[in-house]
Amino acid sequence: MAVQQNRKTRSRRGMRRSHDALTAAALSVDATSGETHLRHNVTAEGYYRGKKVINK
């Protein structure tokens, strides 16, 4: 098993972890159905940018 040769400082640890933060998902409301969905994704009803693209 690998063991580090020198201890990493709190600063180095923090700099490494600075990119680990989670961001909230970007949500949109569809103009036609008023449904909330992920950006650039089809709604559950099959609408994308106000047009029906999937028939259920």
Swiss-Prot record:
Keywords: Ribonucleoprotein, Ribosomal protein. InterPro entries: Ribosomal_bL32 (IPR002677), Ribosomal_bL32_bact (IPR044957), Ribosomal_zn-bd (IPR011332). SUPFAM superfamilies: Zn-binding ribosomal proteins. Signal peptide: none annotated. The keyword Cell membrane does not apply. Residues 1-21 are annotated as: Disordered. GO terms for cellular component: cytosolic large ribosomal subunit. GO terms for molecular function: structural constituent of ribosome. HAMAP family: Ribosomal_bL32. Belongs to the bacterial ribosomal protein bL32 family. This is Large ribosomal subunit protein bL32. It comes from Vibrio cholerae serotype O1 (strain ATCC 39315 / El Tor Inaba N16961).
